[in-house]
A protein has these predicted regions:
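Glycosyltransferase donor-sugar binding loop
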Residues: 21, 53, 77-91, 106-111
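Short hydrophobic beta-strand element within catalytic cores of glycosyltransferases
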Residues: 145-152
């Protein structure tokens, strides 16, 4: 957006300040009641699922992600945390993908408990990020801060945030499913997780973002 403003309005004074997130790990353990309740209800287990978290809108490319996941050979689940209930888009996705025939695809509703959501992120095998419009997306920052392996849609603003810490996919048929198959054959993505957290620590902590706002307002003419 800032680039567009600079190109369209050369005399405008602009300052880009990103969104932020935190790196605090979940305090929950595998034995906690609410953890086990979720995982038992979802019929999944730690490291046994790919994860999507986000608003339930078409521009987040749920259709592509679900289609490609269904093409893949993984035995892991696809856990989708979103506000899908009573949504016409949900019914449309059912019709377009027939995902209800694939026992791996699981829409589980929303999770508003931050500590629990962090645990779910930290124990996902991988996070799939399909957001195609916007800027610094909060969901991507949270994924970089808490999930080792991130499979991210290849668009400029996603790449500008995740850099070399993620694997990228496009909407070409077979692209994401092949990436999932390849990822499923590896077992240690610790280095990618370290890179992702380093990016967040350097660029996207709330302390840094608040400091930038303070600097902006204190230095106003």
């Amino acid at each position: 957006i800032e680039n567009y403003i600079k190109e369209s309005y050369p005399d405008a004074k602009t300052r880009f300040i990103a969104y932020g997130t935190d790196l605090k790990k979940s305090t929950l353990t595998a034995d906690d009641y609410k953890v086990r309740k979720c995982f038992d209800n979802w019929k999944t287990k730690e490291n046994g699922y790919y994860l999507i978290v986000g608003r339930f809108v078409p521009e987040n490319n749920y259709e592509t992600a679900i289609r490609e996941f269904m093409k893949s050979n993984t035995r892991r689940d696809l856990i989708i945390i979103s506000n899908h209930k009573n949504s016409a888009y949900f019914d449309k996705l059912k019709h377009l993908t027939n995902f209800e025939r694939d026992h791996r695809v699981k829409f589980v509703g929303t999770v508003y408990d931050r500590d629990l959501l962090n645990y779910i992120r930290e124990n996902a095998f991988a996070y799939i990020h399909g957001h195609e419009v916007g800027g610094t997306n909060p969901g991507l920052l949270e994924a970089l801060g808490h999930t080792k392996l991130n499979l991210v849609l290849d668009v400029p603003f996603n790449k500008s945030v995740a850099g070399a810490s993620a694997f990228y996919w496009n909407k070409t048929s077979g692209n994401l499913s092949c990436l999932i198959n390849d990822a499923d054959g590896y077992y240690d993505f610790t280095e990618y997780g370290n890179r992702a957290r380093a990016i967040v620590k350097q660029n996207y902590t709330w302390e840094k973002i608040v400091g930038e706002y303070e600097g902006l307002f204190l230095n106003e003419d």
